Amino acid sequence: MLEISSKTNLLEKNSYKYSLQDVAEPNLQRDVYSYGTVPKVAFNHRRVPLNMPEEIWITDTSLRDGQQSVEPYTVEQIVNIYKLLSRLGGPYGIIRQTEFFVYSKKDRQALEKCMELGLKFPEITSWIRASKEDFKLVRDLGIRETGILVSCSDYHIFKKMKMTRSQVLDYYLGTVKDAFDAGVIPRCHLEDITRADFYGFVVPFVNELQALSRQAGIPVKIRACDTMGYGVPYTEAALPRSVAGIIYGLQHYSDVPSECLEWHGHNDFCKAVANASTAWLYGACAVNCSLLGIGERTGNIPLEAMVFEYASLRGSLDGMDPTVITEIACLLYTSPSPRDA
């Protein structure tokens, strides 16, 4: 059967509509990820077209992922960081959003203090696990958008979640439905996408999310998370490590629009910035970063680096104020730790 693609406006075979492959044993892709060797980069000699969106922006995870590698910030430190992010991002909101934990009393107090500032950018969002109990915290805070952790590799599905693919899909969809019912935009964080079965789980899962989104009349956002830093920017690299292939696949096989597509990377193999720029070039509007690259293990995408990548690709800073970066560095390097405050 043929149908018109909304992306290409061409007739395409719907044989490219992938269904869930509910395997009995996890696919750990040991040919690429062997415990005894450095992860391998495979090539399939397939090129995908550049697809730079009309508008691109930066999102921030300094107050979420960044805090996971340092002593937790005080409420005052969080408020100061948020103010500096707003100044750095400028009046047009190139730093569009930031995300907060909501689990502790201090987390919620810091979030509320930042909301009280009334700043337009960066928009305040939250981060939760795919849990109905977690979502109740978000609903009670009146937040417009929340990240929801939805681990998508078999490493996480079978070994962390202790579920099958079909079981975890239903589990995730339950929390997403709660978000839609409450009028909250779900931003689904596809954890460990660079070790996932892209066509056997990722695409079918995102297609289910898209169906729920259409039914609710509320957009769903997709964050592709290179949790271990395995992504590569190389032309003609094969999935699951190809950044271009992941972005293209989510757009072409799951109809995710650029404005709902975000890349989150880590720097374990020193490719965080290159991978983030690749995500922009191939169709993701957003790249998720952390100030000074502070994050788990070797860190996240350095936000300040993407400020200059943005200017290089667009020919303008578009209102961003890079002089604020020095103030940010001074704050993060010289502020007393919470235990000394």
Residue spans for each PLM region:
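Conserved small/polar residues in nucleotide/adenosyl-binding loops
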Residues: 333-340
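Active-site mouth loops of central-metabolism enzymes
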Residues: 62-77, 125-130, 158-165, 195-199, ...
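N-terminal small/glycine-rich loop or linker at the start of catalytic domains
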Residues: 49-71, 147-160, 185-187, 258
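Glycine-rich, proline-tolerant flexible connector loops at the mouths of alpha/beta enzymes
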Residues: 69, 94-118, 153-161, 191-195, ...
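N-terminal capping/small domains of soluble enzymes
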Residues: 2-132
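Catalytic cores of alpha/beta
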Residues: 134-138, 271-281
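Alpha/beta enzyme core
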Residues: 76-93, 132, 136-148, 153-155, ...
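Alpha-helix-loop-beta-strand connector modules within alpha/beta enzyme cores
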Residues: 108-125, 170, 174-175, 244-258
